[in-house]
A protein has these predicted regions:
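Structured-RNA-binding interfaces characteristic of tRNA pseudouridine synthases
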Residues: 1-198
Length: 198
């Protein structure tokens, strides 16, 4: 099995894609999907199976990856506290302004944990936005690829700005490698691999 990307422990995926080889006698992919779902753990569900070219690679052929990080100011419950991050208050206007600083090509040397390729730390963020959906606030990032824990460190910095512990100017300095100011990633439970685009 070849996955489109790896995630940190406790990070979720609603749009993970993988490719594999199945025997030729499997022509009914709906039946195969049902059989697999009956035997997989309840935390994993296959949504769709489709035939692709023999040279398709779910990781290397991906053009864009979309991640979302969910926060709420509402009290969490035992049923949802593993799937969303609770914070006390949200300055929506400030976060909408701050998140735009990530758009573009940057060297994310100061936005990754060990385990990433230390030599190849440049990444392009195509889009970054912050918005509210019902009782949930969403950080939404679209990029070609990411370094290990990059998004959690980005969100961690944004939440520190929200709490007035950091500033947008501090964020600019770290993005431009002038200072390594902030090193604390947001907790994993609010992060989702949402979509892979080919």
């Amino acid at each position: 099995i070849v996955l489109s990307g790896r995630t940190d422990k406790e990070v979720h995926a609603t749009g993970q894609i993988f490719n594999c080889v199945v025997p030729d006698f499997w022509q009914d992919f709906f039946k195969l999907k049902d059989i697999l779902n009956k035997n997989l753990p309840s935390s994993i569900k296959i949504l769709r199976i489709q035939k692709v070219k023999d040279d398709f690679h779910s990781r290397f052929h991906a053009k864009k990856r979309v991640y979302r990080y969910l926060i709420t100011t509402k009290p969490t419950t035992p049923f949802n506290n593993k799937f969303i991050t609770h914070i006390k208050n949200v300055d929506e206007e400030l976060l909408q302004k701050a998140i735009k600083e990530f758009i573009g090509v940057y060297d994310f040397k100061y936005f990754h944990k060990t385990g990433s390729d230390k030599e190849l730390t440049k990444r392009e963020i195509f889009d970054a936005k912050f918005y509210k959906y019902k009782d949930i606030y969403v950080f939404n990032f679209t990029a070609n690829s990411y370094l290990r824990s990059q998004i959690r460190l980005m969100v961690g910095f944004l939440l520190a700005i929200n709490d007035n512990k950091q500033t947008i100017e501090n964020l600019k300095e770290q993005l431009n490698l002038k200072k390594h100011i902030f090193k604390k990633p947001a907790i994993a439970n609010g992060l989702y691999l949402a979509k892979i685009k080919y």
